[in-house]
UniProtKB/Swiss-Prot annotation:
Protein name: Glutamate--tRNA ligase
Source superkingdom: Bacteria
Location(s), subcellular: Cytoplasm
The protein's assembly and partners: Monomer.
Protein source organism: Blochmanniella floridana
Residues annotated for ATP binding in this entry: 253
Cross-referenced CDD domains: GluRS_core
Gene of this entry: gltX
A GO BP annotation: glutamyl-tRNA aminoacylation
The protein's role, per its UniProt record: Catalyzes the attachment of glutamate to tRNA(Glu) in a two-step reaction: glutamate is first activated by ATP to form Glu-AMP and then transferred to the acceptor end of tRNA(Glu).
Lineage: Bacteria, Pseudomonadati, Pseudomonadota, Gammaproteobacteria, Enterobacterales
Amino acid sequence: MNIKTRFAPSPTGYLHIGNIRTALYAWLFARKQGGKFVLRIEDTNTVHLDNDEVIKNIISIMKWLRLDWDEGPYFQTKRLNRYNSIIYDMLQNNIAYRCFCSEERLSLLRLNQMKSGEKPKYDGRCRTICMFKNNAMLNTNRIIDSDKGSYVVRFCNPDVGKVSFYDQVRGMITFDNCELDDIIIQRSNGVPTYNFCVVVDDMDMNITHVVRGEEHINNTPRQINILKALRAEIPQYIHVPMILDQNRKKLSKRHGKSGIMQYRNDGFLPEAILNCLVRLGWSYGNQEIFSMDQMKKYFDFSEIHKSASVFDINKLMWFNHYYINHLPVNHIIKYLSEYIQIQNISDIDSVKLIDLVNLFSKRSHTLKEMIFNYRYLCKDFNIFEKKIAKKYLIPTMINPLKFFRKKLNNISNWTIKTVQTTIKETVHELNMNMNMVGMALRVALIGSDKSPSMSIVVYIIGKCQVLDRIDRAIDYINSLSHD
C-alpha cells in the first residue's frame, strides 16, 4: 500500500493546538511509512469570505514547524467543477436528489420529532416524490417545480443495514443506517458541502489514512456511504481524542491561548511545540523528550490514548526551556534573529546574539523572556526605589563604588571574562563583605536588588552606561547626606 495522509484545515480561523497535533500525527505516520503527506485547504465554507490572510498563516506556520508536504496545497474552491460534475452524475444515477423543502417545513419537522422523542433528521419526503422530477430536470435542464423556489441536493443514504469501520484508536465502530439521514451535499447557492467535498478529495487524492479529531466520528459513516455509492476505496480512519484546557473545557480555535501564531509570537520554539503536542495523547514508555527522528521512529497509532488530554502551558514552558538550553547555540541564535525581525525589535541590534543566548538561556523559558531579561538590565531609570536604596545606597558604600568605577574604567577589552576577573579582583582588594558591596553595585546599576550575576549585569549594560550609573548612585548618596 502506498501510504498517503493529509492535513485539511478550514480557513475559518488561525491554526491552533488541536489542528497542529492532528497535522503532526498524520505527518509522522506518512514519514515513518515512507508515504506522502498532502496539504489541503477546505475552504468551501468560506467561499464568499476574504481568507487570504488566514491561508497565508496556515502555510507560514506549517513551514515554520517544518511539517513539509509532498502535494498541495490544494484548494477546494478551485475544484468546484469536479464536485458539481460528480453531483450531476449522482443525480442521474438516482443516488442523490433535489430537495425543495422549505426551512419552515424542516424546522417544524425537527420540532415535532423532538417533541415525540425522536432523533431529529430529514424524513426523506423529496426522496420519494422528486426522483422522477430530478431526472426530468436533468434531461430538460429546467426546474419543474418553479413555484417551490430554491433547492438543495441530498445524498440517498441507505435506509437499511449497518455501516461499520475500524478506528485505529477506538476499534470497531458501527452505526445503523436508519439513524442517518440524507445529508445535504450541495447547498441552495450551488456550493457543495464539507461532507461531500472531503469524500471526493480523499477519493481523488488516494488518501489511505484519515487522521482527524474525534468530533468527526459521526461524519465518518455518512462519508463511507458516499464513498461506497461512488465505488471508491474506503480509507482507514484514526480519530484522535480532544484536547482540554486546564479547566477541562474543550480547547478550541476561539480559545485565546490556543493559536500557534500566538505561541510563536511569545517566543516558543518549533521543537518545543511539536514535542509537547506529540505527548498530548500519545506516549512511548516514560520518555518525555523526542527529537523529530525519534518521533518518526517510535510513533504509532496504536499508542494513542482514547481519553482527552489536558494542555498545560507550564509543560510547554518546560519543554521550551529545555530546548533553549539543549539545542545548538547557533540554532537558538537563528531563532532569536528571526524573532527579533518578526517582532520588529530595534533596540538590541548592537547586541551580540551569542552573548544574549549564553548569558540568559538558563533563566529564560522563551525567546520573549530572554529579550525581556536583557531589556530589564539595560533599561535606564531615574529614580531609585526608596526602600531598597535606603538599605544599600548608604554613605559607607561611596568609596567602594568609586573603587569599582576606577577598576571597571581601566578595562580596555570589554568581555564577559575580563569583567568577571575585574569584579573578583576588586572585591578581593576591597576586603569587604561581598554581599553588601555587591548589592550596592547591583542597585546602582539596575535599581533593583534582584538580577543575574554581577558580571553578566556589568557586561550587558556596557562600559559607558556602567560608569554613568555608578556616578548617579554616588550623587544620590551624597544628596541624601546633605539633606
